[in-house]
Each structure stands twice: as structure tokens, then as C-alpha cells.
Amino acid sequence: MQMGRPTLLPCLLLLLVLSTQACFIRNCPEGGKRDVHMIQPTKPCMNCSFGQCVGPRVCCGAGRCEIGSTEADRCEEENEDPVPCKVLGQHCVLNNPGNVNGNCVDGGIGICCVDDTCAIHRRCD
């Protein structure tokens, strides 16, 4: 069976399209296709009146955490920044479904925080 030129060209184009892993305008990552596997940059979480922000409206330090107080309201600004922040301190694990990897709040106050909650943790003393 012989394939004519009019048939060969569309077949080659179809093969080319199917074999490439294209990144179209609607689904490209911000840094381009090669940026997908890069580690996302982080920065230390901002400071609040007596410690460090560990979540929106959550401020921890000096042996305590405050949630929703006027001192912790400044931490809401962290949500406006597109670069995610990381709580300073050693790694800890919470029993929080879907969000278990956290960090101890700096200062050895015995509190471990993940993105949306904090709890007393013996590893953080």
C-alpha cells in the first residue's frame, strides 16, 4: 500500500503533536514548562508583635500563641504575599489529616504548627 504526499504530511504532523508534551497558554506553570519540578521558594514567616506568624491571624512566641487577637491580625498580611512562608524551627509531625508536616515554633515553647493549626508537641520542647 502506497501513501501519497497529501496523506503523509497530516500523519507526520499528527505524530509530532502526539509525541510532544506541549505546554499551552492555558496550562503553563508560571516559570514555564521546565519550572514544574523546581522547589518552590519560601521565606521565613513575618514577625508579629511578640513572636512569629504561623498562620493567618495566628501569632506565637514568648511562651504563648494568640489566635484572632489584635496582635495576631498582622499575620493576615502573610496571605497577600504569593511566596509561601516557612515557620522557623525543627520539623515536627501533627496528626492533622492531609496536612501533617509542620515546624516547631522557634523559641522552644513546645508548639508545632502546620498551615492551618497548632498543637502542643513534645518534640518541640
UniProtKB/Swiss-Prot annotation:
What GO MF terms are annotated? neurohypophyseal hormone activity; toxin activity
Recorded hits in PROSITE patterns, A to Z, give: NEUROHYPOPHYS_HORM (PS00264)
Let me know which tissues express this protein, per UniProt. Answer: Expressed by the venom gland.
Extract one GO cellular component term from the record: extracellular space
Anything else known: The letter 'E' in the name 'Conopressin-E' proposed by Kumar and colleagues stands for the eighth residue, which differs between conopressins.
Please explain the role this protein plays, according to its UniProt record: Targets vasopressin-oxytocin related receptors.
The protein's name is: Conopressin-conophysin, isoform 1
Organism field:
Conus monile (Necklace cone)
Phylogenetic classification of the source organism? Eukaryota, Metazoa, Spiralia, Lophotrochozoa, Mollusca
